[in-house]
């Protein structure tokens, strides 16, 4: 999976896709730092799933 910058609604959409029915813990400070300011990949996103 290619790392990419995900910000705002794109980041939320990606979390819905990755986490599905499990849902996710949205901690803007942590995930924006990791995935918006820097590129992140699908494995990084999975860390935020419930």
UniProtKB/Swiss-Prot annotation:
Broad class of the protein's primary localization: secreted
Task: List the InterPro entries.
Answer: Insulin, Insulin-like, Insulin-like_sf, Insulin_CS, Insulin_family
- Annotated membrane-spanning segments are none
Query: Keywords for this entry?
Result: Carbohydrate metabolism, Disulfide bond, Glucose metabolism, Hormone, Secreted
GO MF terms here are: hormone activity
Keyword Transcription regulation on entry: no
List GO BP terms, alphabetically.
glucose metabolic process
Q: PANTHER family recorded for this chain?
A: INSULIN, INSULIN/INSULIN GROWTH FACTOR
Give the quaternary structure.
Heterodimer of a B chain and an A chain linked by two disulfide bonds.
Function according to Swiss-Prot or TrEMBL: Insulin decreases blood glucose concentration. It increases cell permeability to monosaccharides, amino acids and fatty acids. It accelerates glycolysis, the pentose phosphate cycle, and glycogen synthesis in liver.
Q: What is the protein's name according to its record?
A: Insulin
Q: Which organism is it from?
A: Oncorhynchus kisutch (Coho salmon)
